[in-house]
Amino acid sequence: MTKKSRTIIFSIFSFLFIIGGPSAILYSQGYRLNLNTEEGEKLITQTGGIFIKAAPRQVEIYIDGKLREKTDFLFGSALVENFLPGKYNVEVNKTGYLPWEKTLEIKEKEVTEAKSILLFPEEFSFNLLTEEIEDIWFTPEQTIIFKKATTSEWILSLYKSEEETELLRESDVYSKGAKLTNIIFSATSSDLILETEIAKNKRYFNFDPEETPLSLTELKNFNQEIIEYAYNNYTFKKEGESLCVQSPNSDLFEKIADSVKEFRISPDHKKLLYFTKHEISIFFLDDTIVPNKKKGEKMVLLRLSDNITNCYWIKSNHIIFSTDDNIKITEIDNRDILNTVDVIEIKNPEIFWNENEEKLYYLSENNLFISDTLLP
């Protein structure tokens, strides 16, 4: 080989090394050539990734229709990397479960997270618990109180640990008859307050269901119109149907919403759910990443034409709610569309979510049903 040939070959390899060396380094650092740039975007950009955490474990992750990863067995999570900045369709699948799908944006040098994914079963199973139930209440301790009617009077019973225990009868309240209109639960004790109608007058009675023998005490000056609760240095007051909040370091209450049916704190104590006839909303007690909200902000999660009858938290990132003829579950991740699941179509359901058992109870047409465990 002549000296000239060796010089040419050496020059070629030197050129390739000069070009390829930095390119390899840039590639290892996550830089990619972006051929789909729009005006103002960089031709060479760093990639990003998606972090998925889902239950059940070992779900398949599809990105833009391609299987890219599977979550691990131990933690149910996976990191999928090396994506150019942009929007991607992400789908999480597992046999026997309904899929989760959302369009998520990946940014340069950032990891987009979806850490609260729950996949629900394709079929929901319910079992009949008891019949001939007129009304039902659920205690803060996650137990059930229900009212049954006999030919002569109503009976109030407690259902706990799969056992039914009679609490009291109509004649215990008033021998000539008393209409039970509501049960109010104490925020500080196990006491119950019975709201009754006797001779067309409202009368309230306090009793402790754990006390033996039973002792009823009439409350002469009870006012249930104002109910206050404190969470994370916020104080919430429900005055009639108005929900008000007193922020930390403030002496004044600010109205959040009118026509509020009920409000509930999330298990992580970072969010407050409240709902009206046609809206489900959240008040944030702390900063959150998903949804991206600051402490003290409000968010309308859902607006429905149907009448919303009740709502409960599932964990701290999903909500189960009922309408006049449906029970549904939805997430609170408001990036793209909400993943919403139809649980059952049923007439006028009264629902209760038992967080400890991870089971749903519903009352419909005087029959009380209980689900199998809903969470994976």
Task: Identify what each model region corresponds to.
Residues 1-157, 183, 193:
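Short loop/turn and low-complexity linker motifs enriched in small/turn-promoting residues
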Residues 55-57, 140, 149-150, 188, ...:
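Short loop/turn segments that connect beta-strands within the blades of beta-propeller domains
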Residues 127, 152-174, 197-222, 238-256, ...:
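Surface-exposed loop/turn elements that mediate protein-protein interactions on large endomembrane-trafficking
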